[in-house]
Regions:
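Extracellular loop-to-transmembrane helix junctions
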Residues: 82, 92, 103-202, 212, ...
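Junctions where cytoplasmic loops transition into the N-terminal start of transmembrane alpha-helices
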Residues: 118, 228-231, 297-333
Length: 368
């Protein structure tokens, strides 16, 4: 073969290789520019979605022949909710939704007014009501996953007036609960000897934190609730382990049921009437403590797959009530006397008045 033919063959082999290199580099540049364009478009669309979330939703006019209940159902179904809550969000909302100020601080008032036995009776009966309610709510949320939450069921299955009353009461509840929780959080900071002028600033700080969480939509709420619930569950489990050790006498002295007997007593009061009255007063604190259990039903409207996640979340309520409430309150009644002056109701309301804190501090546990 001549040298000219050899050069032609080699040049013919090099040309496709050059074309391949050029085409591959072109594809890489195209994909890179395309990804940048998509990223920019996604950023613009997210920012536009954020701005549009503050606008009023445009709804077409409804047929005048529809009843008021049918109009309410249609308008509720058209509400722009996004199903972005995952199974782990719902699980932690079900577990940690009702663990808060009512348990950590409010139970101190119940202990001082009802005694350890009255505390368990009041919370035990209330928890049985909550268990039935959440299970029924879970069934409704699975069968009718509507956007309005559980208050819409009152309008749909009972009456419009009953639904209005339920919505009004629920709105009033959160109008009171939100500032109460914010102030309670700022008061908790005072446990670490924070100057009073800074405690007031914490109210604004916690309020801004809540506002910022809501800026991130339902997904941000789910992640925040997931993290906060894990912290609360970890605190309760840690207290239960520590409380069992203290009751069994790890610190040197066996406690057992000392605070259930004379001169302390299982109930508050010198006669049956006073003891009954003290026990009944526990139901008020228990009702407040269990507020938040209904968040599972509200979150069903924004859950990706409510038919799968809601039954699991509803079934976990039993373990939450048993483990996080009844066991922890039993240990509180064994470790703290209802005559302790530090309990809320007999002194100022601060974090030191929490029976959980008193139970640990009184037995030499430091570093809280």
């Amino acid at each position: 073969m001549s040298s000219s033919n050899t050069r032609d063959i080699e040049s013919g082999m090099e040309k496709p290789r050059e074309i391949d290199d050029y085409s591959s580099s072109y594809e890489m540049n195209f994909l890179e520019s395309n990804s940048r364009t998509k990223h920019a478009n996604n950023s613009v669309s997210k920012w536009q979605d954020f701005k549009d979330s503050f606008k009023q939703v445009d709804l077409e006019e409804l047929d005048s022949s529809l009843t008021e209940a049918e109009k309410i159902a249609i308008l509720t179904a058209r509400s722009p909710l996004k199903r972005q809550l995952k199974s782990r969000h719902i699980q932690m909302i079900a577990i940690g939704g009702a663990i808060g100020t009512g348990l950590f601080v409010g139970s101190g008032d119940s202990l001082s007014s009802g005694g350890p036995a009255g505390l368990l009776i009041g919370y035990g009966i209330s928890s049985s009501f909550i268990l039935c309610m959440v299970c029924a709510l879970g069934e409704l949320a699975v069968e009718f996953p509507i956007s309005g939450g559980f208050t819409t069921y009152c309008t749909r299955f009972v009456d419009e007036s009953f639904g209005f009353a339920a919505n009004l009461n629920y709105a009033l509840q959160w109008l009171v609960t939100l500032p109460l929780e914010i102030v309670a959080a700022s008061i908790t900071v005072s446990y670490w000897d924070t100057p009073k002028k800074y405690r007031d600033a914490f109210v604004a700080l916690f309020w801004l934190l809540i506002v910022m969480i809501n800026f991130f939509g339902v997904k941000g709420f789910g992640e925040a609730e997931f993290i906060f619930s894990i912290c609360k569950v970890a605190c309760i489990i840690g207290f239960i382990i520590c409380g069992i050790c203290l009751v069994c006498g790890v610190r040197g002295s066996y406690i057992g049921g000392k605070y259930w007997h004379h001169p302390y007593g299982a109930f508050v009061g010198d006669n049956a009437g006073a003891r009954f009255k003290g026990t009944m007063s526990v139901f008020v604190s228990a009702a407040f403590a269990f507020s938040g259990s209904e968040l599972v039903g509200l979150a069903a409207a924004e859950t990706a797959n409510p038919r799968k996640t809601m039954p699991k979340a509803s079934k976990q309520v039993f373990w939450r009530l048993t483990l996080f409430y009844m066991i922890s309150l039993t240990l509180v009644g064994l470790l703290v006397s209802h005559t302790d002056p530090r309990l809320i109701g007999s002194s100022s309301a601060d974090a030191a008045a929490s029976p959980f804190v008193i139970a640990l501090v009184s037995h030499g546990i430091k570093g809280l």
